[in-house]
Structure formats: C-alpha cells, structure tokens
Amino acid sequence: YNLRTEVVNLFANGYVNYTTDYISQVTKMEDERLITTYANADKDLKTGVDLSLKVTPAKWFNFSVGANTYYVTTEGVFEGAHIDNRGWTNNSNLLLNFAPWKGGDIQVQYFVTTPQYYPQLTTSLTHQMNIGIKQRLLKGAMTVSVLLTDVFNTAKWEVWSHNNLFDLKDN
C-alpha cells in the first residue's frame, strides 16, 4: 500500500515467506573450536510487515521513519541436535535530513535492531546513530562527504546460543 501527497509518503507492505528443505548455516564444536558450516534444514517461516513514512514539511528539511517487524521460526536437526529458533524481530530507523545551504546535506540517522533469531544463535538488541555531511561541487560533478558512524559508541553486538552442541555467550 502506498499513500503519497506533496508532504507525506506512507508505504506499508505485508509478507509471508515459507521455505522447506533449504540450506542453513550451522555451527558445531570441533576440537574446542566453533566451526561454521552449512547443512540441510527442515523449514523456515518469516512473516511480517514493512512500514515507512516520509514527511517533507519544508524544502530544506524532511524526516523519515522506517520499521520492519517480523516473526521468524526455523526448524531443523544437525548431527542429532535441534537447530530450532524463533522470535519477534524489529529493525527500525529514523532519518533527519537537512539541506541548509545550496548543494549541501546534513543527515542524522538512528538505528534500533531488536534481538535477531538465526538457527542456533540469537543476537542482542543494538542501536547506533550516524551523522553525515555531504556537499556537491562543480555543478554536481563531484561530491565530498564525511560520515561519522556510531556516534555514541553503542553498537555492541552480543551473540548467544544454548543447544545440544554447545553453549555460547559472547559479550
């Protein structure tokens, strides 16, 4: 669904993805090391919704909010161990875009990712802010940009797993 006016653009999309007999990344213990390989998995279901909203209240400023929320469930057996995992996940971002002078842009973007669910592994919630400045020169023939990523140093990514093959907590 898409609703568009001069000031507002709203987009919504729902989806369902069901896969059987597919190749999945799996991890196993071998000589006190974790080894990542690929194996046949039974099924994977992912269903969710994409939403985005862009508002342009002035020529020099716009903002957008985007979110992808979905439920994922994975089922399979690898070397006798279940590699099942399931949960709700959300990836969201907020973008503020300023055009304070001719040919220039300043962007501030904030990302939030809730825990992600993969076969055998779950990741932690992460968030970060990026700030970018861009200037177009020579009538747009050249662009100079600077991007500062993870401004507040908050993008700590943790992974954990508890299954029949190993227990893992990485932080």
Where do the PLM segments sit?
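Transmembrane beta-barrel strands of outer-membrane/channel proteins
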Residues: 1, 12-18, 65-71, 108-112, ...
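Residues on the lipid-exposed face of transmembrane beta-strands in outer-membrane beta-barrel proteins
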Residues: 1-5, 49-55, 94-98, 131-135, ...
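Outer membrane beta-barrel strand-and-loop segments of large Gram-negative receptors
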Residues: 3-66, 91
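Repeated loop/turn-to-beta-strand initiation elements of outer-membrane beta-barrel proteins
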Residues: 5-10, 59-63, 102-108, 137-144
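Outer-membrane beta-barrel translocator domains and adjoining extracellular loop/strand segments
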Residues: 14, 22-31, 36, 74-83, ...
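Residues that define the transmembrane beta-barrel architecture of outer-membrane proteins
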Residues: 16, 43-47, 84-92, 125-129, ...
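C-terminal beta-barrel architecture of Gram-negative outer-membrane proteins
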Residues: 69-74, 87-137, 160-161, 165
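C-terminal beta-signal and adjacent terminal beta-strands/loops
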Residues: 137-171
